[in-house]
A protein has these predicted regions:
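Conserved pre-motif I regulatory segment
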Residues: 176-219
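Nucleic-acid nuclease catalytic cores
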Residues: 64-156, 751, 757-758
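Conserved RecA-like P-loop NTPase helicase motor core
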Residues: 584-595, 645-758
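Metal-dependent nuclease catalytic cores that hydrolyze phosphodiester bonds in DNA/RNA
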Residues: 1-85
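A contiguous, basic/glycine-rich beta-loop/short-helix subdomain that forms a polymer-engagement track
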Residues: 330-350, 355, 366-373, 473-587, ...
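Signature of the SF2 helicase/ATPase Hel1-core->accessory helical subdomain module
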Residues: 230, 257, 261, 337-354, ...
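A substrate-engagement module of RecA-like helicase motors
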Residues: 177, 181-185, 242-355, 363, ...
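Walker A/P-loop
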Residues: 211-233
């Protein structure tokens, strides 16, 4: 909502269009966007009101409702002098069929004209006015017009009713503009003694980045207090008038909740600040079951029925009674009023100073929040990116898309009654036949199966045409109310393909793979940094931070922040609390794993012999994990072990973590995969984990696709192997090592096992806070070192 409060005039300002749309909306959720539903694009002929409108008094009307001063204004270009009297004209251009304009849309359009008409009548002393509303379809001559002469009395009655309904929201806007701003401007750092070492530098540099409207990339080791160090200056900047809203982006629910917890710590200073965590649509939907298609229509979900009739009541309940909006609170209110929890959270976010959500709500081509990053291009947003080491890989996948021949073979005969659908399927299958021939120009035989591949960085102008035909054919299926999960999944993938093709350039490539009769087409984004850069430009400042951004220059580059300021902080924990050792004479390369497995088992035994407690050993692959664990169990049968399995339910993951109990006597050795669920994002504090051993340098598994990425970076950065394998691998090592020592009073052992860690290449990228690492070559010296450490 674009209504604002001006402290100087002690008044809430809102346009006639905004007021009418907010108060008069009604009907169901039935959003199928480009499939032909009413929720397509709408462009009003006059300019949209921006943050500080230049309001002519002759076209504005001020009233006081329940103690709140409200000014509603309209645009001069809407008023026209006729031969007899005046008309108020609103022209809408839409991108969908005018046949599906319903009473709800017409009601909002007419109420907009009514609201503006009343203002004109008041200022010009008119007894009536003609309200004209016209709809035109973009790119065609199709038009629908609605005309109505309305008396002053009717205009006044409608206007006063809208003001009465808007009044409680106006009070909230006033409180937000006065109380919240004042609270944030005087916000103090919430902990006694002020920021800790390193945290202060983080805060100062964040303030500077916001003031100068630049980006900052921060490597802040565990214990710095990254969440508070980023949130505190960002929120205070709202109070200082430097920003409107803060977005805290993260890829994990645990870090999202940490942001809300930080607000709770400051809550006594900012009681009126509103913060929200937007969960994914799948997690919010009460009708969705994994494996099914989500159907956001009254026929399938009762919470979409009359959603827009009920939304304001639900919204007001939340705004008046809560300030921190978790998924649980939003779900409770959504259930009370029988409305969609996800849509309610999006609506509610517009009233919040802090929005916590996933990366894809900014970066994903089909999931980004259009209400902020398309409709409000001039708003002053601050972006905070937690765990930003995950962003390059997430983004690369967001801008890549895969199609398979078998998907279209499975649906080609489904709807013989829809000729366009059958023809479109056949057209795409013909394309896949061509892809097959291209792939087989580089054919080989693997396990008695004929395989081939083809790579081309160019994309012809007509490449997308058969897929666009298929998109239109899918729409015909949906228009006939034929519900088909399989077709819907293909349709969504084709929409993604269309979006990716629109940004396809030299940073993409087309990869075709044929295995037997199956053909896979993959449009690969090799370097998403340009898209990350473009999306971050939608905010005034971006702060990207993580405990593991090594090397910092590499991450600044792949995050689209090549020219940004950087900050690398030291660990706040005493180095003497960490026994950091590298066994530098063991090779864990794939070809050497059979020879090194027994040695690894003996090294584990030496590491844990110094002190009883809980340990985790991280391996580069599951097969290597199982190989070493079996040897370890055979050699040391009395030592309890637990292992990560290939696929674990949430319940199984919790049980695995619960086994690391600090009150349990004896020793437990956990066997996990590096880069998996238990090497990042878990917080085993105190005695729950006193040691971690990292086997190998974390290199991603070599693949054709990664080698394509490597070749790209060889050409563009002259360092393809490091960009594709070395640096991402080292990041996994640092993340796994970071599971040990989570607070300043903890002590623990971190052991790296691989001869490559002692090479100049790796010594150059080992972070400064690991400068105290000892290099050993045998289990006996390891045992002596850890024993002495624990005796200190």
């Amino acid at each position: 909502m674009s209504a604002i409060y001006d402290k100087g005039t002690d008044c809430v300002y809102i346009s006639a269009k905004e007021l009418a749309e907010f108060i008069s909306r009604g009907g169901d959720i039935g959003a199928k966007d480009s499939r032909g539903n009413k929720n397509g694009k709408t462009i009003v002929s006059h300019k949209l009101w921006q943050k500080k409108p230049n309001i002519l008094d002759s076209y504005a009307f001020t009233t006081i409702s329940e103690g709140t001063k409200i000014t509603v204004f309209s645009y001069p270009e809407c008023l026209h002098k006729m031969e007899k009297g005046y008309s108020i004209d609103y022209i809408y251009t839409v991108d969908y069929s005018l046949d599906i304009i319903d009473n709800g849309q017409l009601e909002v359009a007419l109420k907009t004209a009514v609201c503006a008409g009343y203002i004109m009548c008041e200022r010009l002393g008119l007894t009536e006015i003609e309200a004209n509303v016209s709809f035109y379809r973009e790119g065609s001559d199709e038009a629908r017009e609605f005309k109505q002469v309305i008396s002053y009395e009717d205009l006044k009655g409608n206007f006063e009713l809208m003001i009465a309904l808007f009044s409680p929201f106006a009070k909230i806007i006033k409180d937000k503009g006065s109380n919240v701003t004042e609270q944030l401007s005087s916000l103090r750092f919430p902990f006694e003694g002020g920021p800790r070492e390193g945290q202060r530098d983080f805060i100062i540099d964040t303030f500077r980045a916001i003031k100068s409207r630049k980006r900052l990339v921060v490597q802040a080791p565990t214990g710095i207090g990254k969440t508070m160090a980023s949130l505190y200056p960002a929120l205070k900047s709202i109070g200082c008038g430097d920003a409107d809203k803060v977005f805290y982006f993260t890829g994990k629910t645990t870090t999202a909740l940490s942001a809300l917890n930080a607000i709770d710590i400051m809550r006594n200073q900012i009681p009126d600040l509103r913060s929200i965590h937007i969960s994914s649509k799948d997690k919010c939907c009460v009708s969705f079951k994994p494996g099914d298609r989500r159907r956001c229509e009254p026929k399938y979900c009762h919470r979409t029925k009359s959603y827009f009739d009920k939304i304001n009541v639900a919204l007001l309940d939340l705004l008046e009674n809560y300030r921190t909006y978790t998924k649980e609170i939003i779900d409770e209110i959504a259930q009370r009023y029988e409305v969609c929890s996800y849509e309610l959270s999006l609506e509610l976010s517009e009233w919040c100073e802090l929005v916590v959500c996933d990366y894809n709500y900014l970066f994903d081509l089909n999931a980004y929040l259009r209400r902020y990053f398309e409709i409000m291009p001039e708003a002053d947003f601050i972006f905070l990116f937690d765990e930003s080491h995950n962003l390059p890989d997430r983004a690369r996948e967001m801008y890549s898309v895969t199609l398979q021949k078998s998907d279209f073979e499975g649906i080609k005969n489904k709807y013989p009654q829809i000729d366009e659908f059958t023809v479109a399927c056949q057209g795409i299958l013909s394309e896949f036949d061509t892809y097959y021939q291209l792939a087989m120009s580089e054919k080989m035989e693997i396990n008695d199966t004929l395989c081939g591949f083809y790579i081309n960085s160019q994309l012809s102008d007509d490449f997308i045409l058969p897929y666009l035909d298929m998109i239109e054919a899918c729409k015909k299926v949906f228009r006939k109310s034929l519900d088909d999960d399989e077709v819907n999944e293909i349709y969504l993938n084709l929409k993604k393909l269309r979006s990716v093709c629109e940004i396809y350039d030299k940073r993409f490539t087309t990869y075709i793979e044929a295995v037997g009769d199956e053909v896979k087409l993959r449009i690969m984004c090799l370097d998403p940094s340009f898209m990350l850069d473009a999306c971050m430009k939608k905010g005034i400042c971006s702060i990207l931070f993580s405990a593991t951004l090594t090397p910092l220059e590499y991450f600044s580059d792949v995050l689209g922040c090549e020219k940004s300021n950087t900050l690398s902080l030291k660990s706040p924990f005493p180095p003497e609390n960490q026994c950091l050792i590298c066994i530098s004479n063991v090779s864990t390369r794939f070809d050497d794993r059979d020879k090194s497995a027994t040695n690894i088992a003996n090294i584990i035994r030496a590491m844990i012999a110094g002190k009883s407690g809980n340990y985790i050993v991280y391996f580069p692959s599951y097969s290597y994990l199982m190989q070493v664990m079996e040897i370890f169990k055979e050699k040391y049968p009395k030592i309890p072990v637990t292992a990560q399995s290939r696929s674990m339910s949430e319940k199984a993951k919790k049980e695995f973590l619960d086994s690391f109990d600090e009150k349990k006597e004896g020793t437990l050795v956990g066997f996990c995969v590096m880069g998996g669920s238990f090497s990042e994002g878990i917080d085993l504090r105190g005695e729950r984990l006193i040691g971690a051993m990292i086997v190998g340098v974390g290199l991603p598994t070599i693949s054709t696709e990664l080698n394509i990425v490597k070749e790209y970076f060889d050409k563009t950065r002259e360092n393809g192997y490091a960009y594709t394998y070395t640096y991402p691998g080292m990041n996994k090592v640092l993340q796994a090592a970071g599971r040990v020592i989570r607070s300043e009073n903890e002590r623990g052992v971190v052991l790296l096992v691989d001869d490559r860690f002692a090479s100049p290449e790796y010594k150059m990228i080992i972070p400064e806070y690991w400068s105290h690492m000892k290099y050993l070559t045998n289990a006996r010296d390891l045992l002596d070192t850890v024993t002495k450490f624990w005796k200190k």
